[in-house]
Design a protein with these regions (language model features):
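S-adenosyl-L-methionine-dependent methyltransferase catalytic core, i.e., the SAM/SAH-binding region
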Residues: 1-155
Length: 155
């Protein structure tokens, strides 16, 4: 099993929790983490707000699975809804969950160590690896195919 707690440390964790906490203080508060990753921030949000629920969105199915396992181990799975999607699909995600309002939205934009350190994903320039660079590996279009088939104007 991958020790995800040591793969990616959430950036500015205490500051993020302190910023989100006031919005999540009331009963039935709903938070959305639009870039769930390995759930470091989300676990802290749910621990700080025991009455809140959280929808975790990520387009990386591997990260989503690992985050879900972490939530289960932390005893937070009953207040966590994992969703495989991109953050620009937030409106649809909320509609699918019959949620009309949220109290807090969080985004930690960029790559995580999970993507960079996994050589075969092709995000690191430090290793000779396939030029994949897909955040969602279920999608067929790789960086290699783009570079091989797109003309300069498309790039």
């Amino acid at each position: 099993m991958v020790d995800v707690a040591n793969i990616h440390l959430p950036v500015l964790l205490d500051d993020c929790v302190n910023l989100m906490a006031p919005a999540l203080e009331h009963e039935n508060a709903i938070a959305v983490d639009c870039t769930l990753g390995l759930a470091g921030h989300s676990i802290a949000f749910l621990k700080a707000a025991p009455q809140a629920r959280l929808i975790g969105i990520d387009r990386d199915s591997e990260a989503l699975g690992l985050a879900t396992e972490r939530m289960e181990r932390e005893g937070l799975a009953d207040r966590f809804i994992p969703v495989h999607a991109a953050f620009d699909q937030l409106d649809q995600v909320l509609a699918d969950q019959d949620i009309e309002r949220v109290d807090a939205v969080f985004m930690d934009l960029g790559l995580s160590s999970l993507q960079i350190d996994e050589t075969d994903r092709g995000f690191s320039y430090s290793h000779d690896a396939p030029l994949d660079m897909r955040m969602d590996v279920s999608q067929p279009l790789t960086a290699e195919r783009i570079l091989a088939t797109y003309d300069a104007a498309e790039l």
